[in-house]
Structure formats: C-alpha cells, structure tokens
Amino acid sequence: MFPLNGPGWSLFFEYIGNICYALFMRRMSTKVLAFFTLLLGIAHAWFFVGDISQYDMIGVGWTIDTVNLWGGFIRLLFPFSMGMLLARTFKPRKVKGAFWICTTALIVLFAVPYIPSDNGISLNSLYEFVCIACIFPALVWVGACGSASGITSKANTFLGELSYPLYIVHYPIMYIFYSWLIKNDIYTLSGCWPTALLVVASSILLAFLCLKLYDEPVRRWLSKRSK
C-alpha cells in the first residue's frame, strides 16, 4: 500500500479510525458501544480464526486487495472500539508491581512460537485473537493501575512520545540499510554491527527531531484552532 514507507499502511487505518471516532463513535452510548464491540469481535474471530485470508495470522491490511482491505478494517475497528470501551468503564485500583507484571506477561506472550493450523482452524490466529480480545486489554488495565515516579516516569513518557514518530520514520532508513547490505554481500551481524548501531541511532535522532520540530508544534496549533 505504501511501498516507500511500509508501516504507513497501519497509520492509514488509524487515520480512518480517528475519523470514525470524530464522526460517530464518540457519540455512541456505552451500551451501544459494547454491542458494537461484540459484533466486531465476532467478525474478528470469524475472519482470522477461520483463516479467510489464508495467512494463518492476523497480519493483514498492508495491501489494497479485497482480503487485506476488509481484514484491515476488521483488525482496526475491534481493538479500537475495545479500547474505547475499556476507557469508559475503567475503574482504577492500585496494583503493585504493575510494570513488572506487564513486562513479564509480554515476554511470555511474545515468546510463544507459531502454532500450526488444525482441521481448517487457524490455531495461531486463535491465539492472537485471545491475546487481542482478552489478555492485552487486561494488561492495559493492570498497567493503568500502576504508578511510576521520578526517572522511571520521565523515561516512560519519553519512550511513549518517541514511539509514534520512530515507527513511521525508521523504515526508509532500513531500506537504505538493506540496500547497502545487499550491495556489499553482508548477511551477518558481525559484518555490519557498527553500521547497524548507526542505523538505530539515526532513526531515534530523526524521530526525536520530527517529534519536537513537527509533531508537537502541529498538535499545539491544532489544539488552539479547536478552541
């Protein structure tokens, strides 16, 4: 969908989600939103667990063919509405060690290997669906019930602010890096680690500059215009 910057496809759907929120989703009552989320959850389970895309995973949306386009909308709208519902119904409680609970859980979840399909059922997609529908919302709740202060709070804030621009600017740099690797027949980390470190550092620096020189000023301007 976006050949010069691959991650742009997911932001494309996020923009659509934000438009839907501004036009009608924010006006939904909590009961209507809950019913809407339930329907989207059923569609999500049918599409991915039934392996409609034949990808055996939820990784769809990155092209504009029929399966990816509709799959991308389903992939967007279910977690999006789930997040809205969680925000509306959230009741904070104090959870000790929330950071370590969430960190440990994510390490375990991400360490689970690919699960082969069985009798036409995508078990890998089923696992991913359970994570999206149940486990990730629970982890968001636990994380929101935690607290941080001092350096930890500042570090978390900085990393959170940097994550969005880093996601969208790092891939063009990676393309250049890939081209350099292929041109020089380098296929191991031992042969390119200094350049790899430079790629990481330059990606972070570019993301930081985009955040401070573009993202934050534009958001401040838009906030003033909306008042």
Please annotate each region the language model reported.
Residues 17, 199-211:
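Alpha-helical transmembrane segments of multi-pass membrane transporters/translocases
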Residues 24-28, 61-204, 220-226:
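Alpha-helical transmembrane segments in multi-pass integral membrane proteins
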Residues 38-52, 104-117:
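Aromatic-anchored segments of alpha-helical transmembrane domains
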Residues 1-15, 31-32, 42-67, 73, ...:
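Membrane-interface helix-loop-helix regions
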